[in-house]
């Protein structure tokens, strides 16, 4: 906790600010929950940056970590965006994303419960396949907590749209990178 003169602020547990002895102590005393944002780099029109999906999911993960006392790990900014070719996107193959996320699970599952928070629709299938493989093969047979994967838009009341009202509104709330003069109605 950080104290100011009039209020107490709960600090986000950010993996980049946790050192080995502290992490080991946390893992030993209370198996913490790790939240790992997964985004993408792709076009979002002329008004939003190509990092929009990663920016949004990083902010949501940080807020969840603060509220729920999770440890937020660095965002995986590369995802599966081949559907946007030939427009700007930096995509990785599904098998590579699954393998990369699976490697993370193999390293963390003894120390943490794991939640992947997704910020890009193209990642959903790979995240679900990885989750099923890891849970069936590594975690459930040993009574360990399953890997969980969620996409942030499943918790929204408004219908999701790519580079439209929802993503623009979220980016306006968290960033000064939006160029509203270039937005189309």
Segment roles from a protein language model:
Residues 2-185:
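Extended, histidine- and acidic-residue-enriched regions that form the cofactor-binding/catalytic faces
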């Amino acid at each position: 906790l950080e104290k100011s003169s009039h209020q107490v602020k709960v600090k986000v547990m950010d993996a980049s600010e946790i050192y080995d002895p502290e992490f080991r102590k946390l893992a030993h005393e209370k198996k913490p929950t790790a939240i790992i944002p997964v985004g993408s780099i792709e076009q979002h029109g002329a008004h939003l940056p190509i990092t929009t999906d990663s920016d949004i999911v990083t902010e949501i993960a940080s807020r969840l970590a603060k509220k729920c006392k999770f440890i937020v790990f660095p965002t995986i900014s590369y995802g599966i965006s081949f559907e946007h070719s030939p427009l700007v996107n930096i995509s990785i193959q599904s098998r590579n994303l699954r393998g990369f996320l699976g490697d993370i699970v193999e390293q963390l599952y003894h120390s943490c419960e794991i939640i992947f928070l997704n910020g890009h629709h193209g990642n959903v299938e790979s995240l679900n396949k990885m989750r099923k493989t890891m849970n069936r093969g590594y975690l459930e047979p040993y009574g360990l907590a399953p890997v969980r994967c969620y996409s942030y838009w499943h918790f929204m009341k408004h219908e999701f749209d790519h580079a439209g009202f929802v993503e623009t509104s979220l980016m306006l709330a968290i960033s000064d990178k939006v160029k509203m003069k270039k937005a189309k109605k």
